A protein has these predicted regions:
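C-terminal motif of bacterial Sec signal peptides marking the signal peptidase cleavage site
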Residues: 15-19
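Short, well-ordered beta-strand elements
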Residues: 23-34, 54-60, 123-125
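Short, polar/charged alpha-helical segment
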Residues: 34-57
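Short helix-initiation/N-cap motifs at beta->coil->alpha
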Residues: 58-69, 153-180
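Ligand-binding "clamshell"
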Residues: 89-101, 114-116, 184, 189, ...
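A conserved helix-loop-strand patch within extracytoplasmic ligand-binding domains
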Residues: 98-147, 247-248
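A bilobed periplasmic-binding-protein/Venus flytrap-type ligand-binding module shared by bacterial periplasmic
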Residues: 108-118, 218-231
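Ligand-binding clefts/hinges and TM-proximal coupling segments of bilobed small-molecule sensing domains
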Residues: 132-156, 162, 235-266
Length: 266
């Protein structure tokens, strides 16, 4: 009986230790579908990570809220979906202990529509309703003459403050709903990843009317827990994303919709 109990104990201990070892060699990254998860799942990234003795697991999220919570709570090792202003807002509001480890690419914010208008008078334009992106949308609309001025102090998505001498009206809605307005014949300022997920790179380019310049667009980052920023896992992940094969993958698959701008931020 003692031998049986001992054998069972040894078996359980072996399973536990094996599981721990596997976890130490598995890098779990949360990402939104396109282009983030697609980039991570590319051979360019996965082959490099495997060459260093690690395995990459990508968890796909459909929203902007869950990935930071999962990271802060320890459910994933890193996430890839956001830019630094959004991360800073999340950290300030929710007291998350997470930081940017590297920047990878940017996605210029663009105005999309099925047809380009000859006059924007009295047009309704839909924009994203989160505070970190709404100013980008306003700046884009000012630069192209649709609105004259705006204010983002004490931003309220229900009552955005702006003026337009040509009667343009603005409505703030969830990012995931913006592409529907375009499909219905309307106009919307949409983050690049949502446009890619909705239409793919080719259609997104066709529907684009105007957009940010690449030097204005905010870089999308890899975020990690502060305590893990110098861990071996994160070092390998950053190294993988810095490879020239990743740059080529982005250029080949997304064209001007996504721009490779890698920089180590540690």
């Amino acid at each position: 009986m003692k031998k049986i109990i001992l054998s069972v104990f040894v078996l359980v201990l072996t399973i536990v230790l094996t599981s721990c070892g596997a976890d130490e060699k598995t890098i779990v990254v949360g990402a939104t579908p396109s282009p983030h998860a697609e980039i991570l799942n590319s051979d360019a990234v996965k082959n490099y990570i495997e060459s260093k003795g690690y395995k990459l697991e990508v968890k796909v999220y459909q929203d902007y809220v869950t990935p930071n919570k999962a990271l802060n709570d320890g459910g994933i090792d890193a996430n890839y979906f956001q830019h630094i202003p959004y991360l800073e807002t999340e950290v300030a509001e929710k007291n998350y202990d997470i930081v940017a480890a590297c920047q990878v690419h940017n996605e210029p914010l663009n105005l999309y529509g099925l047809d380009e208008k000859t006059s924007w008078d009295n047009t309704k334009v839909y924009i994203i309703n989160d505070a970190s992106n709404v100013e980008r949308a306003f700046k884009l609309l000012v630069a192209n003459g649709l609105i004259d001025s705006y204010s983002v102090e004490d931003f309220n998505a229900q009552r955005p403050e702006y003026t337009s001498s040509i009667g343009v009206t603005i409505e703030c809605i969830d990012a995931g709903l913006l592409h529907n307005k375009v499909s219905e014949g309307g106009y919307a300022v949409i983050p690049g990843n949502y446009a890619l997920t909705a239409w793919g790179a080719t259609k997104a380019s066709e529907y684009k009317i105007f957009g940010e310049s690449t030097d204005v667009a905010y870089p999308n980052i890899i975020a990690v827990r502060t305590s893990d920023v110098d861990s071996d896992k994160i070092k390998v992940l950053i190294e993988a994303l810095s490879q020239p094969e990743v740059k080529k993958f982005i250029e080949d698959n997304y064209g001007p919709t996504v721009n490779y701008v890698f920089k180590d931020l540690k």
